[in-house]
């Protein structure tokens, strides 16, 4: 694998271990040329997914972009990286096993909202504000009222 620091074609695997509940392999690598250390992940890809944007344009599915969406919504929130990875992997697994190769971006957005709802209420509101294009304070109040009602019904969450 190419070194991200010096672009050398050689790198050595120093450690491999299962990750994401056995759905991936995490590899620690070192570059013999510059000494740079980096981590790679190997995952099974069942099929090539295409995302249909709101404009109708089709783009290849990008797992890293999905992960970044979670990271942005969860920035400075007390959620373990492991839980984020599991949520992302779960969404990817559902998309790949759906049988569809073209998936509307709205469907992914709904799955992200559902996952964030169980991870962190603040992150859910952050993501919903962008995804649902909030333009007024009332939009925030409505979502917060929904969350408050859910907490009142089940205080353990």
UniProtKB/Swiss-Prot annotation:
Keywords: ATP-binding, DNA-binding, Metal-binding, Nucleotide-binding, Repressor, Transcription, Transcription regulation, Zinc, Zinc-finger. Belongs to the NrdR family. PROSITE patterns: ATP_CONE. Negatively regulates transcription of bacterial ribonucleotide reductase nrd genes and operons by binding to NrdR-boxes. Disulfide bonds: none annotated. It comes from Sinorhizobium fredii (strain NBRC 101917 / NGR234). Its cofactor is Zn(2+). A zinc finger (unnamed) spans 3-34. Pfam families: ATP-cone, Zn_ribbon_NrdR. GO terms for biological process: negative regulation of DNA-templated transcription. Residues 1-21 are annotated as: Disordered. It comes from the Bacteria. This is Transcriptional repressor NrdR. InterPro entries: ATP-cone_dom, NrdR-like_N, RNR_NrdR-like. Residues 49-139 form the ATP-cone domain. Residues 11-21 have a biased composition (Basic and acidic residues). One of its GO terms (molecular function) is zinc ion binding. Binds 1 zinc ion. NCBIfam families: transcriptional regulator NrdR.
